[in-house]
Amino acid sequence: MQHNKLREVRGTKDLLDDELYRFQYIQHLAQTIASRYGFIPVDTPIIEFTEVFTKLGNTSDIVTKEMYNFKDKAGEDITLRPEFTSAIVRLLISKNLTIPVKLFSSGPVFRYERPQKCRQRQFHQINFEFFGSDSPIADVEMISLCYNILSELKLSDRIKLEINFLGDQETINSYKIHLVEYLNKYQKDLSEDSQRRLVVNPLRILDSKSPEDCKILLNAPSISDFYTQNSQNFFKEVLDGLDNLSINYVINHNIVRGLDYYCKTVFEFTTSELGSQNSVIAGGRYDGLVKSMGGHSTPAIGFAAGVERLSALIDYEHKKPKRIVLIPIGDDATSYAIKLAYELRCKGIHVCWNNYRGTSLKNELRKANDTDIVLIFGDEELQSNTVKVKDMKTGDQQNVAVCDLLDNLLHRIV
């Protein structure tokens, strides 16, 4: 194999040791909190039929630009999942799950984007979906779940909740007319993407990060001016619920989310510490998605959190167990070391023994200089059923009877 192929594919990253422990800590914490809220863990394949994701919307960047599509050997159109929600909806429908139901999932997703800090082509998400409730209380519960995760990661004071309400269909229809009327005056000044969206999905322009678009949007009509009474009441209940939980928020009427299936409540938890990739958790309602994919009409709300972005923010150091290294001296001691290592590991002791053909005791001790405890034994120790236990931090060394070794080590590693 060519040397230049022995590297990570652009937009992907190997995870080793401490960084992987950070990921696992976040995922484990999320699953623990999910369980408190009554979520069931599920796992879906990373490949799905392409049609599963086309319901994301033909105007979304994910569908038009970012999906990894290919034909398998049977000629089927297959896609590496770019997000979880559509795959979870597919699972809900195909398994005929009883609603209401809350589903938790996590794992890698894939998007063909320009790689940059905290934005890779393969990245990891924790994902929460709640199917079967059209109550604003469900929205409050899901947002509070996000806040719960951030609080336990000690990030709640460094992240801002931005929330918007897209309204009911009557609200959206009325708002689109006035928004398009306003934007048509500046059509030639809009970015290329926004000129295209003006025709197919004008609401997506509100989410533009283009400087020229942002300037134009400053004086654009606000969707809140077109809320029906039902929309006003629903949004008020959501905000009252957040106030009741003392969860601070900022209303941002430009949040529409990047996927076409969102409706009513949409939200993002953002930070100023990650540059342009400022969204850490994002989600909202998608009451029409299940029906559009062939299921029954099912109200739903969900969100996803980027593990890489959370990992970049948290202050976490994996507490590694104390390492115990074996240094057998001689062939008989080496044979005994195999048995000793196995027995200690079965009792929960972390034993490191990689050098099966040791050199001198001096060299082996030098190699073990950065470890915690060393067990030394040769012919003399085998005959007396003892082991030399050396604390590499203090230099203390003592002979310990084999029958007392486990208790001795457990006392040292606590």
Swiss-Prot record:
Enzyme class: ligase
Catalytic activity: tRNA(His) + L-histidine + ATP = L-histidyl-tRNA(His) + AMP + diphosphate + H(+)
Principal subcellular localization: cytoplasm
Keywords, alphabetical: Aminoacyl-tRNA synthetase, ATP-binding, Cytoplasm, Ligase, Nucleotide-binding, Protein biosynthesis
EC number: 6.1.1.21
Cited InterPro entries: aa-tRNA-synth_II, aa-tRNA-synth_II/BPL/LPL, Anticodon-bd, Anticodon-bd_dom_sf, His-tRNA-ligase, HisRS-like_core, HisRS/HisZ
CDD domains: HisRS-like_core
GO terms assigned for molecular function: ATP binding; histidine-tRNA ligase activity
Pfam families the UniProt entry points to: HGTP_anticodon (PF03129), tRNA-synt_His (PF13393)
Localization in the cell: Cytoplasm
HAMAP family linked: His_tRNA_synth (MF_00127)
Record's protein name: Histidine--tRNA ligase
Biological source species: Ehrlichia ruminantium (strain Gardel)
Gene: hisS
